[in-house]
Every structure is written in structure tokens, then in C-alpha cells.
Amino acid sequence: MLIGSHVSPQDPLAAAQAEGAEVVQIFLGNPQSWKAPRPREDAAQLKAAALPIYVHAPYLINLASANNKVRIPSRKILQQTCDAAADIGAAAVIVHGGHVADDNDLDEGFQRWRKALDQLQTDVPVYLENTAGGEHAMARHFDTIARLWDVIGDTGIGFCLDTCHAWAAGEQLVHGVDRIKAVTGRIDLVHCNDSRDAAGSGRDRHANLGAGQIDPELLVAAVRAADAPIICETAEEGRKDDIAFLREKLNS
């Protein structure tokens, strides 16, 4: 089971070595911008590296939106991100589920997701990540994810489970792993994060493992059940300890 972290995109290989990471995740551009990722001078080096590199797509992406000024740029930047991810030999691109205006629009949101995936041209796998909060979200509650998966599951899309997000959404972590696997067939990646807030808060505020509200042993049980590569999206100070903690627990 590979264990690593979300690191600065400046030199991910050096960051991985410094943190003892066996796998990393990076942004390829500003996560709060619609601008396409710039070509990387080290693309060939990253592509040749043995280290698996995952790419997190910009937060602005909302493939479910009925608003053309949001949905169309979302499709464009996802395509550009996947193209840039292919250039570095990325293992996958992770994208949030987005949301619609009201619950009456959920089914239309699922169809917009389907259309976006049908139009996407890439050999890089794309993983949907569950989200912490937001009204009328595509991927906050597991029941809604199941409905979305009925529409998009046969496109080859994968799934990334974020423990902080599931906690914030009020989902049970270990039982939730079984529920998600029953829907998607597998979990492809885990974002193992503690939460600064109470269960069901809807707040997406990560904490280093053991420094938040989630029992560390519960996190260990969840990631063990998920049986997928692990990325710690926690504060840089303490992240090396997060990796070491998980490695000790999961290898014991």
C-alpha cells in the first residue's frame, strides 16, 4: 500500500524524498484559476520517474452546473489538465463533483457529468472525489454518489475517497468504504486527512493525523479497508509524521 502526500509542484521528486513519500499529488497550475497549466521543463523527468504522481484538478471545476459560463470552462480546464497530466505521465487526475442549483436539478447534473466525460479525450484516468459540504452537491453524500454512478459508472471513471470530506458530510468512515465499494466496485485513491471540525459539519478543514476530531485508529481502519494508494493532504509541518504513522500502523 503506497503512502505519500500532496506536495508543492516546484520539485515533487525532491519533496517526496524529503517526506518519505512513495507517491505524491500535485497541482499543475493555480487551483483557483481557469488558466491552463503551463508546460513543465521537468515533464520528461517526471514521466520517467518511478514515483507515481497524481494530479488534482482546479477547485473551480463544476461539470454539473447549468450555467454555461461555469460548465463550459470546467470542461475545457479539465481537458487541459488531463493533457498536462499526460505530459508528466500522471497516474490519474482527481476532480471534485461540483453541484447544481437545487435538488430538482440533480438528475440533470448527472447527465451533464456524463456528457463531460463522453467528450473528454484522454488516456489518463479521472477520479471523482467526494466533497465535504455544499448544498445540492454531486458527491457529498454517498447516496447521491450512487445515483451519479448509475449514470457515469460505465465511462471508466475512478473514485477517490477523502476521509475528512466523508467525516464532514456525516458519513461513517469504515462502513462508508464498504458502501462506496458496493457502488463503484473499488476505491482507487484515498486522501487520508483528519478534520478540524465535528462530524457532519460540512466544513472542509484538514488537520494532521491525531490533531483533529477523527480518531486516528478510525482513519487507519478506513484506509486499510479501502486498500488503495494514500495521499495525506495535511499541513507540511507534521506531514512527514503523518506518513510515518500510517506506514507503521498499516505494516504492523
Swiss-Prot record:
Its annotated function is as follows: Endonuclease IV plays a role in DNA repair. It cleaves phosphodiester bonds at apurinic or apyrimidinic (AP) sites, generating a 3'-hydroxyl group and a 5'-terminal sugar phosphate.
HAMAP family, per database record: Nfo (MF_00152)
What cofactor does its activity depend on?
A: Zn(2+)
Please report any disulfide bonds recorded for this protein chain, giving both cysteine positions.
none
Would the keyword Metal-binding turn up in this protein's UniProt record?
yes
- GO terms assigned for molecular function: deoxyribonuclease IV (phage-T4-induced) activity; DNA binding; DNA-(apurinic or apyrimidinic site) endonuclease activity; phosphoric diester hydrolase activity; zinc ion binding
Q: State its Enzyme Commission number(s).
A: 3.1.21.2
The source organism is: Mycobacterium ulcerans (strain Agy99)
The protein's UniProt keywords, in alphabetical order, are: DNA damage, DNA repair, Endonuclease, Hydrolase, Metal-binding, Nuclease, Zinc
What does the cofactor field's note say?
Binds 3 Zn(2+) ions.
Query: What is this protein identified as?
Result: Probable endonuclease 4
Per UniProt, Zn(2+) 1 binds at H56, H96, E129
Reactions catalysed according to its record: Endonucleolytic cleavage to 5'-phosphooligonucleotide end-products
Its taxonomic placement starts with: Bacteria, Bacillati, Actinomycetota, Actinomycetes, Mycobacteriales
User: Does the record carry Glycoprotein as a key word?
Assistant: no
Q: Where, by residue number, does Zn(2+) 2 bind?
A: E129, D162, H191, E233
Q: Which GO terms describe its biological process?
A: base-excision repair
Question: Which family is it part of?
Answer: Belongs to the AP endonuclease 2 family.
| PANTHER family in the cross-refs | APURINIC-APYRIMIDINIC ENDONUCLEASE, ENDONUCLEASE IV ENDODEOXYRIBONUCLEASE IV
Give the encoding gene's name.
nfo
Q: Which residues bind Zn(2+) 3?
A: H165, D204, H206
